Amino acid sequence: MPDKFKRVHVIVMDSVGIGEAPDAAKFGDFDVDTFGHIAKHVGGLKMPEMGKLGLSNIREIEGIEKAEKPLAYYTKMQEASNGKDTMTGHWEIMGLYIDTPFRVFPDGFPDDLINQIEAKTGRKVIGNKPASGTEIMAELGEEHVKTGALIVYTSADSVLQIAAHEDVVPLEELYEICEFCREITLDDPYMLGRIIARPFVGEPGAFVRTPNRHDYALKPFKPTVMDALKDGGKDVIAIGKISDIFDGEGVTESIRTKSNMDGMDQFIDVLDKDFNGMSFLNLVDFDALFGHRRDPQGYADALVDFDGRLVEVMEKLTDDDLLIITADHGNDPTYTGTDHTREFVPLLVYSPRFKNGGSELELRQTFADLGATVADNFDVKMPEYGKSFLKDLK
């Protein structure tokens, strides 16, 4: 590939794994396959655009034809880090290796942490267990409205979430509480990946979350490829929750989104901008609305909707653009429980410059190969981990 690309666009389909990783059993996962099991559940997925790129060339997905001449280079990536959460996946994509997993609290948080929150805020804590946000809001929302107590809960991820009605706990107060929780959980014994403010509105029986969610992540422990790009004078446009995942590090512009389709709208708007660097989009609905809630039909519909938007994306790309579509972990909605699943993730790499289409790339042993390729393209500092496949794109 003689000329470098002016713009690289990375789309992370949050949780869209493509089959069980070799070490899945170590993570308690057996026979997991997000893409495959969704397709089977609905009797085949209709995703012609992803099909043309070469999705079923990676491995066959029911309903999606294998492309005779795939438009994209294709393979799958294996996660090297010791985790299967959003932060671990994204940080590895951008060149980090996470050896010590973020802590999870399947039985709720220790009394010491809860006592600190109550002492600081003057509010009681209710909940303190793993739960779906919508379910715990329905279960404890009325008590919260009556008493002003904070609904604190966790999930299978390394996360502490605080739900509060906007008329009971004003947004600024909720954000301040979450900032305090962030400060006291940065290190052992808690070492939480994220604190999330989960505001809601409405009446008992009809509570609904607002778009004013805010994530407080850990800062990456080392510079990522995003930092290298920013330091090298390149643009890093973070769309969706990307800026939250990296706690703003290495980001030159952040664009919030309200849904997958809003994310695609924002991304398509970014394609109209003249910039030199990377756009980085996370589509969280796959994970948050359908994976954790074990809703394979909803997940399938969201995949089909995403595929439909790729037509607009492809129309806007030029020979100066490189599009990379991948995921950060699995979340098989047909599997037991509500946790993420340890899986390979798809990798599709496309540019209109590939006049003869794409072909199979070698299996990537770490997500960091993606970040290394981006760094290689822009001639910035290479990450410690990862092997660029830029030279394989012809």
UniProtKB/Swiss-Prot annotation:
Top-level taxon of the source organism:
Bacteria
* GO MF annotation terms: magnesium ion binding; manganese ion binding; phosphopentomutase activity
The disulfides recorded in the entry are: none
Instruction: Specify which residues bind Mn(2+) 2 according to the UniProt entry for this protein.
Output: D287, H292, H340
Query: Which cellular compartments is it found in?
Result: Cytoplasm
- Native organism is Listeria innocua serovar 6a (strain ATCC BAA-680 / CLIP 11262)
Q: What is this protein called?
A: Phosphopentomutase
**Cofactor needs:** Mn(2+)
Pathway assigned in UniProt: Carbohydrate degradation; 2-deoxy-D-ribose 1-phosphate degradation; D-glyceraldehyde 3-phosphate and acetaldehyde from 2-deoxy-alpha-D-ribose 1-phosphate: step 1/2
Q: Which reaction does it catalyse?
A: 2-deoxy-alpha-D-ribose 1-phosphate = 2-deoxy-D-ribose 5-phosphate; alpha-D-ribose 1-phosphate = D-ribose 5-phosphate
Gene encoding the protein: deoB
Cited function: Isomerase that catalyzes the conversion of deoxy-ribose 1-phosphate (dRib-1-P) and ribose 1-phosphate (Rib-1-P) to deoxy-ribose 5-phosphate (dRib-5-P) and ribose 5-phosphate (Rib-5-P), respectively.
Q: Which Pfam families match?
A: Metalloenzyme
- How and how many cofactors are bound, per the record note? Binds 2 manganese ions.
